Amino acid sequence: MNKLENPLQNDIAGPAPRHRTTQVMVGQVAVGGGAPIVVQSMTNTDTADIQGTIDQVARLSQAGSEMVRITVDRDEAAAAVPHIRDGLRKRGITTPLIGDFHYIGHKLLADYPACAEALDKYRINPGNVGFKNKRDTQFTDIVEIALKNDKAVRIGANWGSLDQELLTKLMDENAVSATPRDVRAVTREAMVQSALLSAARAEEIGLPKTKMILSAKVSSVQDLIAVYQDLASRSDYAIHLGLTEAGMGSKGIVASSAALGILLQQGIGDTIRISLTPEPGGDRTLEVQVAQELLQTMGFRTFVPLVAACPGCGRTTSTTFQELARSIQDFIRVEMPAWKTRYPGVENLNVAVMGCIVNGPGESKHANIGISLPGTGETPAAPVFVDGEKVKTLRGPTIAAEFKAMVIDYIEHKYGAGAPAVTAAE
């Protein structure tokens, strides 16, 4: 049957409806319950290094991270947390801080009540919160401290530190089953059960769903998709997405984007982190940028103006369009922190920097402002289009500088004080 004979019920392209979850407030940030999908990140500083951690949280926040997780692994780190919070507040930064606890979180939160108060959310790993007869007691201790301080909790299972007693139990049951499942399927079930059983236990202690976020991270793309599909189908807790140990560079970006993109398209996920291994001395804010670009590319949110640029081919032997596209993109990234306040709505701007006559004029017309640079053998002229209309033709060695000035002028007139109100639909 021809596809046109059986059209889709909805002609509007887009993701599936968001999975209905219970909204959780983390500081002043809403997670789940239909709220915009939240971008978060994690520091890699020694939390006991107060100034270093303040500086990195500030950079992550400025880059667009809406929540930042910090490691709280020992006494010195726990003692530093309130000073970190206070130092950030002095800079005007109110980004919620999440404490990442393993093994001794119950003790650190009890011994350092100022730490418990300063954090906005506690992350509990059900695989190492305690072992054997201590597990329930230590888990209960953290939940009760969260209740006392009115804090949110993320119950985050991870298959690198999965609850071994639960996994062994499920493996033993599977071994004697008449229809045994694949070992990886049993491991995925253990991940989901670990999160859900812990959440049920937290509710028994008194922690409401409005204070709980769940995650179940693995490092395999296909397993991650299956785990979160299962988790979402069996609960309405707010969900944090992330591919653990995604890796470095393009590999980590591609793997995380593939996994999270599929889940987001299916309506699953209330907050995300792109867990990238930074290059030595690399910029930690890259994971924030990638998370934002994923959400913006898929149409969930807008963070910064988009710069469209053609990939280049034999018609574009000049590097001018590439250099201009990079220059405009970098310029926008640098200016966005100030622009957010000065030019409300500027994040919806679309800029096109094209390299030849084939797609250049058409793509430039689709953008708010676009330029079509000449390709090899073409007339050395670059038409500029504003809101679909050709307004000027640039020539000579100052094309790049002139176009950047036109972009700035467009922003000032479109989004500056006194400009008409701009909506995302525009």
UniProtKB/Swiss-Prot annotation:
InterPro entries: Dihydropteroate_synth-like_sf (IPR011005), IspG_bac (IPR016425), IspG_bac-typ (IPR004588), NO2/SO3_Rdtase_4Fe4S_sf (IPR045854)
Pathway the protein takes part in: Isoprenoid biosynthesis; isopentenyl diphosphate biosynthesis via DXP pathway; isopentenyl diphosphate from 1-deoxy-D-xylulose 5-phosphate: step 5/6
Sequence positions that bind [4Fe-4S] cluster: C310, C313, C356, E363
Keyword Cytoplasm: no
A GO molecular-function annotation: 4-hydroxy-3-methylbut-2-enyl-diphosphate synthase activity (flavodoxin)
Top-tier EC class: oxidoreductase
GO biological process: isopentenyl diphosphate biosynthetic process, methylerythritol 4-phosphate pathway; terpenoid biosynthetic process
Cofactor descriptive note: Binds 1 [4Fe-4S] cluster.
Cofactors demanded by this protein: [4Fe-4S] cluster
Record field: catalytic activity: (2E)-4-hydroxy-3-methylbut-2-enyl diphosphate + oxidized [flavodoxin] + H2O + 2 H(+) = 2-C-methyl-D-erythritol 2,4-cyclic diphosphate + reduced [flavodoxin]
Domain of life: Bacteria
Keyword annotations from UniProtKB, A to Z: 4Fe-4S, Iron, Iron-sulfur, Isoprene biosynthesis, Metal-binding, Oxidoreductase
Enzyme Commission (EC) number: 1.17.7.3
A Pfam short name: GcpE
NCBIfam families according to UniProt: ispG_gcpE, PRK00366.1
Function: Converts 2C-methyl-D-erythritol 2,4-cyclodiphosphate (ME-2,4cPP) into 1-hydroxy-2-methyl-2-(E)-butenyl 4-diphosphate.
HAMAP family: IspG (MF_00159)
Family: Belongs to the IspG family.
Name of this chain's protein: 4-hydroxy-3-methylbut-2-en-1-yl diphosphate synthase (flavodoxin)
Gene source species: Rhodopseudomonas palustris (strain BisA53)
Name of the gene encoding the protein in the UniProt record: ispG
